[in-house]
Amino acid sequence: MTSPCSARLQLDENLQLMQAGSPMRKVKSRSWKKQRYFKLQEDCMTIWYNSKKTGNTKSTFSISDIETVREGHQSEVLQSIAEEFKPELCFTIVFHGRRANLDLVANTPEEAQCWIQGLEKLIETVTNMDRKDLMDQWICDWFQKADKNKDGRMNFKEVQDLLKMMNVDMSEHHAFRLFQMADKSESGTLEGEEFVLFYKALTQRDEVLKIFQDFSKDGKKLTLLEFVDFLQQGQLEEENTEEIAMDLIARYEPSDTAKKLHAMSIDGFLVYLCSPEGSIFNVAHEQLYQDMMQPLCHYFISSSHNTYLMEDQIRGQSSIEGYIRALKRGCRCVEVDTWDGPNGEPIVYHGRTFTSKILFKDVISAIDKYAFRVSDYPVILSLENHCGVEQQDAMAQHLKSILGNKLVMSTLDGRIPVRLPSPDELRGKILLKGKKIGRLEDSLEEQPDDSLGEVSDEEENIEVEEERNEDKKRAKKSKERLSQELSDCVIYCKSVPFVSFQHSRAHYILYEMSSVTEYKARKLVREPGNDFVRHNAWQLMRIYPTGLRTDSSNYNPQDMWNVGCQMTALNFQTAGVEMDLNDGLFRQNARCGYVLKPSFMRHVETTFNPDQPQGTEGYSPVNLSILVISAQQLPKVENSKEGSIVDPLVRVEIFGVPIDQTKQETKYIENNGFNPMWYETLHFKIHVPELALVRFVVEDYDKTSRNDFVGQYTLPFKSIKSGYRHIHLLSRDGTKIPPASLFVHIRVTDASQPEQDT
């Protein structure tokens, strides 16, 4: 059976050479370099490689698993063998998610180029596949897996094995009936189009057909008016529904005849429901839709802790790959932990542990290269400086020489700021967060203008003078430990110790900011009143995990977002609920790494209190009703027994202010991970919707132990689209797992209005 990918690319010379196979060295370290035989499968979608010595298949991976290919010595592993192998022989395969990169050395430059160009073409082809191509590819993939003897046809025994692989528990009688219906040639086997018929019969969506027929008079098509009715009544769209209907028909209806009639067939209807426009995530929020001209302190900023670590904090690997991955995920604040290194070169690692070490200048070079690949909004380097003055000077030189004019070395207008600059004003810029000698005013010739206001009261003058004297004492003390050159690189993010909210109001300036541990932040969250929220309306604050988290685990970031903390730093290398929430929040606004805080968190006189939101700004309760209808083609649980089939349940979790934290789940469906049906409605009341995140989780029920994770999807409540929606599930590490999805109906009503049944 020919895959759409191989059919499209079968004449490509590079791919033909890749299908013939090539011996290459797989490299893990300077001392671990082993010969492997790599080959592109006939489907043009799978690479397998084996040991040249034994001939046993060692591993396979899909082209869809690959994010990009890097040419030359672009990984630390390949840099370590640069003297042994020329760059034109080397390349790195980078995978989606947290999977380790694959570093390879070809035997000739021509062979390396063949694989680099071939892989790039395959990645581009897969990326540009439409839904029909993807469906054809999935069908082909299943056929390849089930056709054990590789004779190009499938007998009934192979079909039965396939059903188990697909998480389908079906009676032998029903399976044989579907098999016979598809076996048009009556040969006792399925091949080519016969298998396509079988797959389509297997994947028929009865629940979608029912919705279609509810709105279709003849049961065969939706006229334009019928489709408009569906958009208004089913999808709860209120504006421009006729224009939307025309656009959706033009884009998703496969039949030219139906298009000319401005009608939609059941095939087009299903394609639309599975498209981005049929997704639960509002496509308008995939664009840059927020005001980016507010001061930095008015945004939640995607922030990473111990960015250089790939694993735990005791023996884990330090790598520039940590920075590359974080920045490519939209992270805008990365941590650089510096220590004195040999040969006068500062190094980055988790100090006083067995983690490996990397050069500071290599980290800055990686940041320079990748800072603005996915977002052109500012990157903040959070500097944890343990170096002596001499190597601090070296750090300053590297920052200036490598980053050039990207590094902010003065206020934007050369004047003392009266507010923090906006993300828009700082496009393409890199800010250094760290300690600074004295005040910013000392390094600027321009003095404050009248807009800052004059201090006329005699008592205030005395207080200011005393404060200046204290500043001079502190500056003199810090000069002994801090390089002037490095200090001059700190402009808008001067690090100062946090004492109390009252102390910050009395002594600190808007360009000064504090970093506190999650433990201290939680204590501040528990303080009565809303001082924390007000503080974060005018000054930046960074929260980071406690040092006790040696396994690089994370804390719940929602608690910090509830009080407006901008930089809630997490260990990006560690998958889990906490990173799901982070990915969910920053999924919106073009994934640019900046999300505008709600208006009630952006002014210092706000009354909003997350612990007691009733009667304050931000309190606008709504009812959320979720009808969980079905799931489609759920993946097998990791490390599950052969032949086992999942018993799926769906849990919906609400994260937000304390009163909104809750979860509900459906019953489990026994032995059906392929097309389970629930038709269960879950009801929630959300009091502060602008801070709420909704997480959909699918688990494999286990009555004797903990349920196993199957997939999840997290998004801001305000980004949810009402109506019939698909939720395209993600794996534990946040990568896509097509075609796995949930199908739901969403209804949101004002909490003062009675809910309607779906």
Swiss-Prot record:
Cofactor note: Binds 5 Ca(2+) ions per subunit. Two of the Ca(2+) ions are bound to the C2 domain.
Motif (GBA): 213-243
UniProt entry tagged with the keyword Calcium: yes
GO cellular component: endoplasmic reticulum; nucleus; plasma membrane
Ligand binding (Ca(2+) 5): 700-702
Coiled-coil segments on the chain, per record: none
Domain annotation EF-hand: ranges: 134-169, 170-205, 206-237
Residues reported to bind Ca(2+) 2: 183, 185, 187, 189, 194
EC number per UniProt: 3.1.4.11
Function per UniProt: Hydrolyzes the phosphatidylinositol 4,5-bisphosphate (PIP2) to generate 2 second messenger molecules diacylglycerol (DAG) and inositol 1,4,5-trisphosphate (IP3). DAG mediates the activation of protein kinase C (PKC), while IP3 releases Ca(2+) from intracellular stores.
Name this polypeptide is given: 1-phosphatidylinositol 4,5-bisphosphate phosphodiesterase delta-4
